[in-house]
Curated annotation (Swiss-Prot):
Catalyzes the phosphorylation of the position 2 hydroxy group of 4-diphosphocytidyl-2C-methyl-D-erythritol. ATP binds at residues 108-118. Pathway: Isoprenoid biosynthesis; isopentenyl diphosphate biosynthesis via DXP pathway; isopentenyl diphosphate from 1-deoxy-D-xylulose 5-phosphate: step 3/6. One of its GO terms (biological process) is isopentenyl diphosphate biosynthetic process, methylerythritol 4-phosphate pathway. Gene3D superfamilies: 3.30.230.10, GHMP kinase, C-terminal domain. The gene is ispE. It catalyses: 4-CDP-2-C-methyl-D-erythritol + ATP = 4-CDP-2-C-methyl-D-erythritol 2-phosphate + ADP + H(+). It comes from Cyanothece sp. (strain PCC 7425 / ATCC 29141). This is 4-diphosphocytidyl-2-C-methyl-D-erythritol kinase. PANTHER family: 4-DIPHOSPHOCYTIDYL-2-C-METHYL-D-ERYTHRITOL KINASE, CHLOROPLASTIC. Coiled coil: none annotated. The active site is at residues 11, 150.
Length: 324
């Protein structure tokens, strides 16, 4: 049985519009109806999957899953999405060999970059190969949807339009080659449930109330112009059309995030925005040199030892596999 290394890219949002409450037969489900453009970036975690060693098998783990991580704040039990992904596969395909997972964490935790989701996606892809299950990408995405709304996207990666709860995906043309500078304070996190609940409290009166109204709102929204810019790979237009409704509630509540966004904007990028519910802010650049200038400008403007910055690129794929 082979062992595998998997590269799991982070994800940012280029567009996030809240249409209203997610409805089934005009009844709210408790989620939001969203229109998003999701984008993989080259900042990645790395996972190694291998069959359990004899020593590990002697521990009689149930399920037979052993997780290691080089980040001290990452839990190693069922509270970790990586562990839950492996447990889900074991539940669906019992009797397979146990697995030992080593996670090398590079994507910051609590950053809104789908770090947990992309790691879970890597486990699904890796176990499908290791156990020789022969599952299709669509079947893996259906399993992933049981773990979280971002997991199906992270399996395929690249650039996608996501609607509904965010799990109805349509692939878009690749944007590989555009650079992105990411910024996050490592002592700061934003609760995603808080962000959406606060948005609902403040803006529910403006929600589209029926499925028909929501579809009209979606078609009239700004995503169409962004999709056209993506089709033409027009980085300047893409940068100008970035949009995130959650900025309306997160930025006023988190002045450091708002200040970081302003400092990114001061560097004249193609565009800048908070990703998802934050607190990560990003700026797009059309070259490595421009990205370096943005990085240096923000670093010089914010003398905060808790601010982490990364330069990476938009990338055109999700989970990448390398046999060990």
């Amino acid at each position: 049985m082979r062992a595998y290394t998997l590269i799991a890219p982070a994800k940012i949002n280029l567009f996030l519009q809240i249409i209203g409450d997610h409805l089934q037969q005009d009844q709210p489900t408790g989620y939001h109806n969203l229109v998003m453009v999701l984008q993989s970036v080259s900042l990645s975690d790395e996972l190694q999957l291998r069959p359990l060693s004899g020593e590990a098998r002697s521990l009689r783990l149930d399920p037979p899953i052993l997780l290691h991580c080089d980040h001290p704040q990452v839990p190693l039990d069922q509270t970790n999405l990586v562990y839950r992904a492996a447990a889900l596969m074991w539940q669906k395909f019992p009797g397979q060999a146990g697995v030992e997972i080593t996670l090398h964490k590079r994507i910051p935790i609590g950053a809104g970059l789908a770090g947990g989701s992309t790691d879970a996606a890597a486990v699904l892809v890796g176990l499908n190969l290791m156990w020789e299950l022969g599952l299709t990408q669509l079947e893996l995405q259906e399993l992933g949807s049981q773990l979280g709304a971002d997991v199906p996207f992270c399996i395929r990666g690249g650039t996608s339009l996501a609607v509904g709860r965010g799990d109805q995906l349509s692939p878009l043309p690749d944007l590989e080659g555009i650079y992105v500078v990411l910024g996050k304070y490592h002592d700061l996190s934003v609760s995603t449930p808080w962000a959406y609940q606060t948005y609902r409290q403040q803006f529910q009166a403006s929600y589209a109330q029926t499925l028909e109204e929501q579809e009209q709102r979606r078609q009239q929204g700004g995503s169409g112009a962004l999709l056209k810019a993506i089709a033409h790979r027009d980085g300047g237009q893409i940068g100008q059309l970035l949009h995130n409704d959650l900025e309306k509630v997160v930025l006023p509540a988190y002045p450091r995030v708002e200040y970081l966004r302003q400092q990114f904007a001061n560097q004249s990028p193609l565009g800048t925005m908070m990703s998802g519910s934050g607190p990560t802010v990003f700026a797009l650049a059309d070259s490595a040199a421009a990205a370096e200038e943005i990085y240096a400008g923000v670093r010089g403007a914010i003398a905060d030892p808790y601010l982490d910055l990364w330069i990476c690129q938009l990338c055109n794929q999700g989970i990448q596999v390398q046999p060990l």
